[in-house]
Amino acid sequence: MEVHGKPKASPSCSSPTRDSSGVPVSKELLTAGSDGRGGIWDRLLINSQPKSRKTSTLQTVRIERSPLLDQVQTFLPQMARANEKLRKEMAAAPPGRFNIENIDGPHSKVIQMDVALFEMNQSDSKEVDSSEESSQDSSENSSESEDEDDSIPSEVTIDNIKLPNSEGGKGKIEVLDSPASKKKK
């Protein structure tokens, strides 16, 4: 401890030494609580001696080759060849041959699929679960007729369609511009 620039000895500490900046450093305080291992001084130093890194060495292990990776690597060149073949055919063919809206001609076999995609909310998923349970119960009871089960309609119409969030009230439909309104004018 210093008073007005003069060092004063304390009974519990050894005489302080000065580091390169002129600040007194007590070796006892720096090694306190270390049990002779260097104390806080070694913990604060970035380049302190490493603890035993030799005992905890990491090992590199070779991973087996994935069969999925093999399949992908054989598929990608086939896909590239097919794309190149299609580009060449498109360049040599008449303009309307590869039009997906033109289904006339040799490729007239077309399967049309109408798919609706919507997000179900929590109440919808509970109703689906209950309808699945009721359909399982009805399949177990052979005495009930299938006409009474309205949970699985055969055709979607305006009367039986269920739109998400339709419980909150009716939506507002506003026609801004239509061919019928143009004919009236």
UniProtKB/Swiss-Prot annotation:
InterPro entries: NOPCHAP1. The keyword Transport does not apply. Residues 1-40, 118-185 are annotated as: Disordered. It is found in: Nucleus. GO terms for cellular component: nucleus. The modification Phosphoserine is found at S34, S66, S178. Keywords: Chaperone, Nucleus, Phosphoprotein. GO terms for molecular function: box C/D methylation guide snoRNP complex binding. Pfam families: NOPCHAP1. One of its GO terms (biological process) is box C/D snoRNP assembly. Residues 143-152 have a biased composition (Acidic residues). It comes from the Eukaryota. Residues 10-21 have a biased composition (Low complexity). Interacts with NOP58, RUVBL1 and RUVBL2; the interactions are direct and NOPCHAP1 bridges the association of NOP58 with RUVBL1:RUVBL2 even in absence of snoRNAs. The interactions with RUVBL1 and RUVBL2 are disrupted upon ATP binding. Client-loading PAQosome/R2TP complex cofactor that selects NOP58 to promote box C/D small nucleolar ribonucleoprotein (snoRNP) assembly. Acts as a bridge between NOP58 and the R2TP complex via RUVBL1:RUVBL2. This is NOP protein chaperone 1. It comes from Homo sapiens (Human).
